[in-house]
A protein has these predicted regions:
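HotDog/MaoC-like acyl-thioester-processing domains
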Residues: 3-13, 91-150
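Short, charged/polar low-complexity linear motifs in solvent-exposed/disordered segments
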Residues: 36-37, 49, 82-83, 120-122, ...
């Protein structure tokens, strides 16, 4: 992934980006869950084994936070940062201790703003994938992206 700063005008439908990786540990899962999603199957190995997950699983919100980190640190370097305007998220399967995640993203839509000519709306589809090639999260995000000065 190039570290070139990208403006709305630089992007094309079909452009793709791949991030670096992030390894998830059991301690990470429990630490995040203790603060933000304190459900037994995220906090306790025994409770997790007896849950529908059959073992310790990261909160979906933890997976989403990892995805955001990977996009910000290794995804497309957007001129104004990653400014979200909504989207849809689906968790396809649990993120487990030891998973090594990366994100693959594709530009699926670009719409110049009619009312604010200094920006446009980017629809970016990002799949968070583990070391086995399995999609653990699917995110379609609408992002506000700055245009180049006229």
């Amino acid at each position: 992934m190039s570290q070139e700063t990208l403006y709305f005008d630089d992007l094309k439908v079909g452009d793709s980006f791949t991030t670096g990786t992030y390894e998830v540990s059991a301690a990470d899962i429990k630490r995040f869950a203790a603060e933000f999603d304190p459900q037994p199957f995220h906090l306790d190995d025994e409770a997790a084994r007896n849950s529908m997950f059959g073992g310790l699983a990261a909160s979906g919100w933890h997976t989403a936070a990892i995805t955001m980190r990977l996009l910000v640190t290794g995804g497309p370097k957007l001129a104004n940062g990653v400014l979200g305007a909504g989207g849809e998220i689906a968790w396809k399967m649990p993120t487990r201790p030891g998973d090594v995640l990366h994100v693959e993203s594709e530009v699926v839509e670009l719409t110049p703003s009619r009312s604010r000519t200094d920006r446009g709306m980017l629809v970016l589809r990002s799949r968070t994938i583990n070391q086995h090639g399995e999609v653990v999260q699917d995110l379609t995000a609408r992002l506000v992206v700055a245009r180049r000065s006229a």
